[in-house]
């Protein structure tokens, strides 16, 4: 039994870097601490406990993690500092040496943080607790809301793909998942708490079922039957795991939205092979075509990495032309970052930082062009929009089913409500459409 009396009336701050999955897991950590008697520190209040959930997808992510730790140590003198997440799993010794860090928890340990916090006293030096990647077995459930309107439901963790540029399998372990029954129950609980929208999160969610003998399609169908949840979004799914069966089901689903996020990474078959991706451009293009065939107005986001080792100028031009021809909505562009221990380091051709920047800027410009064209096609239409809680100012925003961001005049009564909105022209920044509520 853990003695939780030491946690009573203590305060905590939380800092999360990286993906939606990390935000979901931080929320679960916060829930564990709340149940032990810890409250979230108010703005400007010195905290007794600092939780940092880290990312390690790039070298820049590592740097941001270190900066965040230093900043929190300075802002909250005397606080017990706990660092977890991918950077903590990959470099526990380095993190433990950072001045002010008390406890470092790996992927397997973060769900049990109370037992590692002990008496909640500062340590002489950081203590690291991790498990070898090959021995990471547990699946820690997480369904978070926090200060976000939508819920994030963790359905899967880990990855078995071992792409040549990526350290995530080493940080997260092998693919594993919750049971459909447990995930449906979490969705029902979210609905009971007033949730209208759930985003399915994971590392490789299309690989769902490895540890339970179920399939992602089975999960989609089961969640679609949960009463009270009006919208589901699939956060990201590998193209080779996005079956025509899933696409067709979403097109006629009650609650799964016409919104997909699909990692391409490169539009060059040669580079995809160097990356050890499990598809080629022909398969990727066929998935986009299938989506648009049955859902012409679907929003499709695509991940692209520029400047990977082996990406010659010719291969990039080939990739650019392929992406230019795809009927997609938005590009999420990342510059390749060298990661220790990856197979990509054995590839000879190295792209200069200047070339990476130029390629990134070209793709970002293309993305902007595609997104604005997609938004413009919907001007003048009336569409249901799920409104999100207003922030400071005269405007609040929400999203259509196909993920168009819409701004309307602020009205707190509209928070978490689905209302019909007439879509007008772009806002001044060009980041949303101005809307008028019609009901």
Language model features: what each stretch is:
Residues 145-149, 159-160, 256, 266, ...:
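Short flexible coil/turn linkers enriched for glycine and charged/polar residues
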Residues 93, 315-320:
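Short, acidic/polar
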Residues 262, 303, 323, 331, ...:
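Hydrophobic, well-ordered secondary-structure elements that form the walls
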Residues 346-439:
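Terminal RNA-binding accessory module
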Residues 98-101, 121-123, 216, 250-251, ...:
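Short, hinge-like loop/turn segments at secondary-structure boundaries
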């Amino acid at each position: 039994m853990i003695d939780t009396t030491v946690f009573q009336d203590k305060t905590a701050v939380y800092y999360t870097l990286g993906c939606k999955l990390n935000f979901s897991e931080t929320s679960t950590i916060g829930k564990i601490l709340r149940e032990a008697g810890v409250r979230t520190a108010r703005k400007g209040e010195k905290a007794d406990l600092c939780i940092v959930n880290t990312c390690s997808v790039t070298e820049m992510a590592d740097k941001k993690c270190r900066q965040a730790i230093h900043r929190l140590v300075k802002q909250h003198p005397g606080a017990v500092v706990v660092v977890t997440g991918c950077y903590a799993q990959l470099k526990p010794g380095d993190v433990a040496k950072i001045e002010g860090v008390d406890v470092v928890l790996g992927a397997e340990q973060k769900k049990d943080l109370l037992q590692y916090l002990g008496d909640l006293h500062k340590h002489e030096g950081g203590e690291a607790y991790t498990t070898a990647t090959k021995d990471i077995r547990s699946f820690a459930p997480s369904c978070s809301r926090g200060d976000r309107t939508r819920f994030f439901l963790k359905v899967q963790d880990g990855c078995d793909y071992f792409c040549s540029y990526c350290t995530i399998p080493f940080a997260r372990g092998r693919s594993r998942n919750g049971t459909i029954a447990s995930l449906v129950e979490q969705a029902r609980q979210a609905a009971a708490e007033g949730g209208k929208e759930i985003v399915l999160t994971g590392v490789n969610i299309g690989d769902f079922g490895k540890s339970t003998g179920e399939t992602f399609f089975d999960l989609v169908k089961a969640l679609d039957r949960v009463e009270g949840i009006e919208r589901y979004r699939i956060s990201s799914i590998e193209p080779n795991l996005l079956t025509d069966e899933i696409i067709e089901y979403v097109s006629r689903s009650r609650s799964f939205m016409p919104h997909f996020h699909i990692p391409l990474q490169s539009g060059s078959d040669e580079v995809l092979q160097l990356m050890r991706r499990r598809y080629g451009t022909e398969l990727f293009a066929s998935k986009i075509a299938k989506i648009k065939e049955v859902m012409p107005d679907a929003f499709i986001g695509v991940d692209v990495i520029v400047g990977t080792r082996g990406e010659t100028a010719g291969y990039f031009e080939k990739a650019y032309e392929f992406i230019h021809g795809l009927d997609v909505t938005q590009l999420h562009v990342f510059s390749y970052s060298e990661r220790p221990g990856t197979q990509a380091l054995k590839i000879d051709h190295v792209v200069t930082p200047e070339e990476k920047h130029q390629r990134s800027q070209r793709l970002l410009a293309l993305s902007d062009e595609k997104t604005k064209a997609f938004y413009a096609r919907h001007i003048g239409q009336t569409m249901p929009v799920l409104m999100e809680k207003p922030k400071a100012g005269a405007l609040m925003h929400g999203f259509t089913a196909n993920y168009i961001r819409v701004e309307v005049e602020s009205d707190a009564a509209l928070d978490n409500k689905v209302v019909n909105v007439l879509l007008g022209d772009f806002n001044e920044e060009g980041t949303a459409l101005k809307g008028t509520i019609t009901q």
